[in-house]
């Protein structure tokens, strides 16, 4: 029931008593009134309504659903979102009104039945229900049960009239309409019954009735249903489609047969055994014992062991029975649900008062509906219907209980038949004695004293079954009792109660199940003594039987209890039958059970059909009503526009009219006037007169027959033949290039959401900021600190949480990644977002077999209220935010890219996304990878198609997780397969469907009320009566867009009621309506007001790539079809932006998509016709996969490159190879480009990086565009791999343009996007029109020339990869090396002092070479001049894990530890640190250190160097550590055992001695062989002048942004005094550098540091300035150091120990007067770059850096990101200023001489 805030208003006082206010009704249909068997009866209705109250209700309804003004951030709750509680509110008296509208006689069976059509009114909603006499009987029975179990008393207040109990003819039953009406009304007056589940279910009252935004409920009720979708049947995929169809067709029928067979074959025999064995376990045992008096007495005792054994056996049998039942219950998949028929779906609720459905079956365009019959075959249910679509079938069974009843009766009959027929399987032999040879009782021994008394005495005999024989004994004597006796202990015996039966009892029929006994068993046969007819024989008589053997008959007698037996010398003759049991008997019995298992369900089916055919009960009444409603919806679906590209979504055609023409057209249609020949004034006059006449009619007739306007019931109708669908509302699109504009639009749309938000993504980061500071983030709030960092409240999780708290329901559907391959951490996303009940998150797939789970869900969808959708290639995740400037660095003090949002996937992919504020790479030295993407927002009918796709996927995931729908073989007893099962989604109703019902002519009564005649209608044909009709408004009202014509027209069609649709003609007000409901569309009241700025009206077709595994539907590849169609129909040019370009041609059996073939065919056609046709392809220079492109170890990076090059230019199936046979100049038709950007890093170095193109876009002829999430590869295009969605957007608005130097009408939307992209890539102004003609030779050559010029400049300045000059791996050797790693191993057999303990010559096979890059790739000796390098001895967080000395050496067990630590996490716990301490520090075998090109290391504070007091982590105290080092005169731990390698490894030219030359090529991770090392190394002497300056050359700056984390340390006086001179010197140095890079030379640091105080050998460096000398003198000896430390600590500021905020810790401070800018000053119109002059680089104050290590490039020094040396920046400045835009050539010859395809990876993963 609705909550207190629901939009279900309590009717007025007049409306509470009114039963006839259902609107102005037309006369009965001519079809109905023309029937011969019409009987009229009267139904009394109450008084009239007031017209003023109707108008008030009308206004309230109009105001309830239409949002007239912005909500200022507040959320308007929908009627079904107000109360989420599961408890149903009490139904107040008079809130539900009921009346019988009409009675119908239907002859669906042999016996006609009467169907009552009741009218239920609840609040502002009314509907009709269909029921018969059997439903009323069932209602009354359920009410009795409800009162008994809930109220604990019998139902006495309301009695079912006897006339309803009695069976009568249908024509006479119609006279009971008043009785039925009064009976239901009496039930509604009782408070308890009014709120009872049986009555509310009968009246179909549920909260879904009030859910206006989901559309009207055409039919509701409890039914049994099955969903036969994918994953609902085990092994649903077969090798043959015919076999698969047959399997699906008969699966549940065979399961039902198997179920009944299991009952008959297993459960039935076991139950019989239980019934006959219970007395054995639980009955007391009786024995004869000797009493004290010497007589025999019966002793009774309980067998305790038998009781427990019986309980155990009973429990096991019950468990087995329940197991079989539950097993087949899940196999059949039958569930009981409250099912609601909506215009778009079947919504199934677990309970009637639920607000969210547990299962939803969506209708597609071509869904089918058929009644259940023997031909249908799915379930063989005569009282049900089957609705089918591409996603499967749903079976609605309205008579499931009747089916169960007939099945149960048939089962019992078959079981009884098996028991009765089982005697036929035995070969009986009779044991019959000749009575003529016997003697009467008077002469029988042992009976001499027998006298006749009241107590019956039994005589008889017993025998022992011979060995090796099992027999079955029975007697035809009704009085005979056969028992199994226990072995006698004396002269008495006791019967075994487990084998005790009488011939005339049910035990007689149990036969082989209970009466078979084995060898050695004593079987007694006794009967009451008949003194007259019995004859006695002597005990011990032998009787021979051929099949059994000799039987010795011993006489026994017993009393009436037949419990204790005593021996007697004679016995009476009793004839019995004895049959031996053989294997033949058991086989026959099993065959009986098997035949019975098949006969039972078949008989049940036939009995159900027969009873239904006769019409004895009426489940078909409900079935027929359900079926007619579904069939009517089926007709409506088929009236829609056909689809394109084999898509699931219908084609939407937008129409464009201006305001005046739209108004005139609508009015002309309303008055049935010719538009061209009728003046506008005449149209207005006609329409106004119609409205006036309607108002007068309503006032003259009163409002007694008018329903409140809030019920949306209108009398205007259109017949089926004259129906003309109104023009659909227009579709509009708005472009969003790059994430800044996209996220801003999403933020605004999410903030304005009213009802629900749907999000689907490949990756969703809850910590993503949608708006960024300095860009589109709103100004600071008044309560914020103006000097502090601005608080960003646009984090995705915060925005969604705010809307969830406001009542908006949020559904997030994300891809569940394969953890071994991806690090998306979707589990973290789910945990972070699911913090409110209104936020639901699903991850899919849970388990996937296809290709080992490599396929993914790749859509990027955000849908707001199902009325505004964002579709494109942009994920809501890290690394995507960017704008048109595409900066590669973020030097601002208020960063735009925080934490992991500053990323470069090629350098380092995302890890630990649950820690969003950790840096992935070094911000000071490593550039971020700019991200280019294109998204769009759409409004109009296509939004419902996008929402349909997402809802279908959501519901499919729910159905896969729903244990009650699955029929897998492993689910039996688990009541809930998932603890929190999400609810399904129902599409919103944007057609504004409302129900309208006909009524009879009213007749005024004396008391002022009205009387309505209820017709009796005989339905001989179901097609005669339709359940509802469609009446749509002539002019659908839809919200206007920011551009283009206003929609709807500004002038109202009805001055009296603007929201009311126009009338088609005056006659339609009184025209007849068909019997049943009328479904009317009133778009103006149902469609939300959507604010869609900068939108253009166009046609939009939604396409997708889905299959069984992803969406539960047959494979759909409509995106590929759309691409091929647009390419084939293009006339002038194609512009393609895509992340990948992998396609194939005919004959290529590996790559299956044929986009490339369509492209070749189109170019071939252009060549043949001598047409100018251009193809622009813009794609990434390198795929964004982490890897080493110069390594021979091929990875995913090389694999994707291989397939892209194979598509473009390499191989016989490539594009250029195919074009060679078509034209000699393919370069005139197609060109490939990339994007690249340069900038200045915070460390002062110029750098470049590719702009990663992630968009999935194609523009054709400036008139059509395809945009979505689908890449050009098989994963996205084939449909059976990744799930995708895309939009085909065709312009409907055109403007003048130029194409091929000729006038051309170009589309407004497509050309707008294309020009925006061209201007951004080429660096043009926003109003530049030089690229307006993309086909002309001038534009073609200019674009190619710009790209070529930019490429040459980038290669000349940065020497970056990829490049056409790098044709093989050997070409990488010519690229400058910027960092190298020196590797050594310890030789434990050598003694220090005699030889080096650490040496490169100790390296073993499998170790790194002496000199390698970061990945272990050897570096040739002739490529490195060590004098140009310096040791990186700064200890970051990762290096602290190793035992690092002050020469930069890091120690570990083996070289693999270095790679693991470098590529894995950095937030190590204490346990992990202890592990490294024990394993790596104490057992170190190898060591490694890094050498970096001079000028590339970021400036650092001297206190951060390895010589700092604070950096000596290996010692217990700073003072003692420094004192020990000063006493030793050495600052290097390694100098005590070896000569510094940085000197010994140099030859006379400064090169590396002992390094390995690769001989012209490099091998990835080459295993180093110590035998190949030179034996003698050229060592320079101890002359310090010839030694390369390793330390002390670089000045130190305390606030470098690349510095890793360190705490504030107290400043020494020397540092404080030298601060000003440092800043002055640095400023002057920067200003005089042309390229903006600091001048290094021989300038010494003005600060007191160990850089300027000591040389490498520990001696005092004399080449220092005065301040350095003074500072160093304090540390010159043992006496001076103590005073220096004392003064140092005395001057420290205690506040410096405080840790700064997390945001400030990751970035450096800037000048207050500094103006933020996107790009460094190397671009045109800018002076020297600002990053070097920031106060953050020059301030004396130390700041805390990031905790992450300085990221090391995964691909070594050859990468898309490259830097410029300081010596080259002056020259580079002039060259870089000549770059225009971002466009560069795509390197088609990159690594053309190498094989890039990995042999171990499957091909389909990368294509």
Swiss-Prot record:
Compositional bias segments (type: Polar residues): 1531-1547, 1568-1578, 1597-1614
EC number(s) given by UniProt: 3.1.4.4
Subcellular location: Membrane
Gene Ontology CC: membrane; plasma membrane
Keyword Membrane in record: yes
Gene Ontology biological process terms, A to Z: glycerophospholipid catabolic process
UniProt keyword terms in alphabetical order: Hydrolase, Lipid degradation, Lipid metabolism, Membrane, Repeat, Transmembrane, Transmembrane helix
Xref: InterPro entries: PLipase_D/transphosphatidylase (IPR001736), PLipase_D_fam (IPR015679)
Entry's Gene Ontology molecular function annotations: phospholipase D activity
Catalytic activity: a 1,2-diacyl-sn-glycero-3-phosphocholine + H2O = a 1,2-diacyl-sn-glycero-3-phosphate + choline + H(+)
Uppermost EC category: hydrolase
Family under the similarity heading: Belongs to the phospholipase D family. TM-PLD subfamily.
Purpose: Hydrolyzes glycerol-phospholipids at the terminal phosphodiesteric bond.
Descriptive protein name: Phospholipase D
Organism: Phytophthora infestans (Potato late blight agent)
Name of the coding gene: PLD
